[in-house]
């Protein structure tokens, strides 16, 4: 099968890659580009572990073809921290112990980042709704919601 050449922007950097027409963006990110933060939990878009932001829209990268990233902006968990400085969401997830095994954590962080970009002062209900596409089998959701609430407060003051 002939490869597809793709030029895109990932976490602010121009990136070019060659992928197969049927290869998912998740597989491209992980296997071709070494960006292993997004995880494959289900492969059907049900769990949110592979969440990324594509042109300011939260998507499951397991449902997007790698070729569809042509000319678009991709944001992954790897782009959240700046050097050793964690994003406020990452910091608050640590402080609130809002993670355990870590499989779901990158997806939750990206979904929360997307939510707060669109709604910087969400209610608890809005946070729960905004994160409803992400599943956690270990920690539960209360610590995650509290971490997002706390991060929203910090980010408003920044």
Question: Where are each of the predicted segments found?
Answer:
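Signature of N-terminal electron-transfer/Fe-S-associated modules in redox systems
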Residues: 1-158
